[in-house]
Regions:
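Outer membrane beta-barrel
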Residues: 1-107, 116-118, 124-132, 184-190, ...
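Detector for outer-membrane/organellar transmembrane beta-barrel domains
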Residues: 115, 125-204
Length: 204
């Protein structure tokens, strides 16, 4: 269940709840955001850390019926915290967006865990025409070992076609585990249809 809207021209909110996650109700996202200045926004609450491309997609934006290995197992982190985002319009069909923040990676539904180390995440998105380039870093400390990640992706979308490739590197400090590497490559061809409530068929 998703609820979102504006309470003022410069203030919006978003709430997303999973009513049955293995028999339990779980709050996925609950945040508020304010437009501080032109292109500059401040957001606070619980939400996905600003990192990754496929991992950053919400349930309503999944490309496939489930998440990829990168989005499900390699990096799937929500946290309670705050972030700043800034969008810079460039010449022509270009745009640069940067965002970053600090988080407590324990969800608001779990109040018994005390986290001493904050998690951090930042990403940059450069769009030029039909191409979107994304890169970012994330540093989390779920236990006694800090884990550092970085990723890069490229998405091309035009007409009915969308192609995307992403790489993610997950490094454990103090050689606690071997470095993990994740790759994702997919293509989607969308065909418009008229079949009841359905208006699109995808071949992936």
């Amino acid at each position: 269940v998703t609820l979102n809207g504006y309470i003022a021209p410069s203030i919006d909110y978003f709430i997303q709840t999973d009513l049955c996650d293995r028999g339990k109700m779980k709050i996925l996202d609950a945040w508020g955001r304010i437009a501080v200045a032109k292109g500059l926004k401040f957001q606070a609450g619980q939400f996905r850390l600003p990192f990754g491309t496929d991992a950053f997609r919400g349930p309503g934006n999944y490309v496939f019926s489930n998440r990829s290995f990168i989005g499900k197992d390699l990096c799937n982190v929500r946290g309670v915290g705050a972030k700043l985002s800034y969008t810079i319009p460039l010449s022509g069909y270009q745009q640069l967006s940067i965002e970053g923040g600090a988080f407590n990676p324990t969800s608001i539904s779990d109040h018994e865990v005390w986290i001493k180390e904050l998690s951090y995440a930042a990403k940059g998105i450069y769009t030029i025409g039909n191409v979107k380039l994304v890169t970012g870093v994330q540093s989390i400390s779920p236990d006694s070992i800090r884990v550092n990640l970085w990723n890069a992706s490229c998405t091309w979308a035009t007409g009915r076609w969308t192609l995307e490739g992403e790489y993610m590197n997950k490094h454990y400090t103090h050689n606690a585990h071997k470095t993990a590497h994740g790759w994702l490559l997919w293509a989607d061809y969308a065909m418009p249809i008229k079949a009841g409530v359905f208006n699109r068929a995808s071949f992936q």
